[in-house]
Each structure stands twice: as structure tokens, then as C-alpha cells.
Design a protein with these regions (language model features):
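A short helix->loop->beta-strand "cap" motif at the edges of active sites that frequently abuts
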Residues: 86-87, 152-154
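A short glycine-rich, Lys/Arg-flanked "PGG" loop and its adjoining helix->strand segment in the class I
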Residues: 143-153
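Short conserved AdoMet
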Residues: 57, 151, 172
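Class I SAM-dependent transferase core
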Residues: 1-63, 96-111
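Alpha-helical transmembrane segments of helical membrane proteins, especially in multi-pass transport
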Residues: 136, 140-143
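Active-site capping/gating segments
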Residues: 163-203
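Conserved SAM/SAH cofactor-binding pocket of Class I
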Residues: 50-133
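Conserved beta-strand signature within the Rossmann-like core of class I S-adenosyl-L-methionine
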Residues: 153-164
């Protein structure tokens, strides 16, 4: 097992182990994650999702968009269960097979989240304090989703690869926003973009 922070409880570690086992099992049937990443799942998926959670401000409502195979959304739900006042977690996913997996994983890990089976752009604004999305779309598209679903003053968290500066430059053509690149703990070329103040350009 990849090293987890020492403040993660044994119960949470067991829930994360259960999640990874489920991902490995279901990936053989539906395309949850790239099969090549399953063996290195602690680093590629669990730790990568954990850093998203650790970077976020305390939230009353967290929305994970395009949750897919459960990262970071299911990990967020598992970690929030440790908190005295856990956030309401909403997972948005349009693929019904993946929604079935998400509900199964929530049941088997004992985590709590709402699963919305719909396209992100068709979901009524969620008013979330924190919005996250991983490996979903270019930044300019993600900003549109975040602008729709973030509460005023909310934060968006988007893991991005080595070309993140180009994505920021492209997004700045249509959006005003602040972006803080935080070095990834799982990939030296990647960052976690912490974004706020999202507004479309006038006209």
C-alpha cells in the first residue's frame, strides 16, 4: 500500500482499500479507469484524490463533476465521513453504468453522497462551496461548469498535467479567474489548480 498520511484513520484506510478492490473488479467489465493504472491505484487514484481534498477549504457542499470511476468524488465522500461536520457530497455522472458503480461503492464503503445521473450542463445549479473534476475537459470548459455550479465565493479544484500553462492562457480569452498552481504530490509534471473568482468576459 502506498503511504497515506498518518492522520487517516484505520477505518478510512479500510474503506479506501474496499474502493480500490471494487474499481479493479468493475474495470474488467466497464471502463472506469485505464486498466494500466489499477495496479498503481494507491498513487494514481487514492493519493491523487486525497491531495484534492487536502487543498480544499472546509465545505458544506462539495460537487464532483464527471465523477466516472470515482476519483476524486468517492475518495472525497470517504474522507468527509471522518469529519465532525461532513460536507454534503454530490457526484454528477452521465454514464448510467458508472452511476451504478458509484452507488455500489458508496453502499459497500459506507460513505454518503448523492449521485446525479445526468449531463453536467443539464443539472440545475448546485450552489456548491467546492467543485472538483479530474481528467474531464479542457480548463475553459471546466470554468463554464464551475461558474454554473459554484456558490458565490466558491472554489474550483482541477488536477492538470504538464500543459496547464497553455490551458490557463486559452481559458483567459473567455474567463476572468484567479488560479493558484499547487505542485502535485503524485506527478512532478502535474499541478492542482485552485481557482476562484470565476466570471465570463462581458459580451
Amino acid at each position: 500500500m502506498e503511504t497515506l498520511p498518518t492522520d487517516v484513520s484505520r477505518e478510512t484506510r479500510e474503506r479506501l482499500e474496499t474502493l480500490l478492490a471494487l474499481v479493479g473488479k468493475w474495470t474488467r467489465r466497464i471502463n472506469l479507469v485505464a486498466p494500466s493504472t489499477v495496479e498503481d491505484g494507491w498513487r494514481r487514484h487514492i493519493l491523487d484524490s486525497l491531495q484534492v481534498h487536502r487543498t480544499a477549504p472546509a465545505a458544506r457542499h462539495w460537487a464532483d463533476l464527471g465523477t466516472g470511476g470515482g476519483f476524486p468524488g468517492l475518495v472525497i465522500a470517504i474522507l468527509e465521513a471522518e469529519r465532525r461536520a461532513p460536507a454534503q457530497v454530490t457526484l454528477v455522472e452521465s454514464d448510467r453504468r458508472k452511476c451504478t458503480f458509484l452507488r455500489t461503492a458508496l453502499r459497500e464503503t459506507g460513505a454518503h453522497a448523492s449521485v446525479i445521473d445526468a449531463r453536467i450542463e443539464s443539472v440545475p445549479p448546485l450552489g456548491a462551496d467546492v467543485v472538483s473534476a479530474r481528467a474531464l475537459a479542457p480548463l475553459d470548459t471546466l470554468l463554464g461548469f464551475a461558474h454554473r455550479h459554484c456558490a458565490p465565493g466558491g472554489t474550483a479544484l482541477f488536477p492538470k498535467g504538464a500543459r496547464w500553462p497553455e490551458e490557463i492562457a486559452a481559458a483567459e480569452r473567455d474567463w476572468t479567474f484567479s488560479a493558484e498552481p499547487i505542485p502535485s504530490i503524485t506527478d512532478p509534471d502535474a499541478v492542482l489548480l485552485r481557482i476562484g473568482g470565476i466570471a465570463p468576459h462581458a459580451g
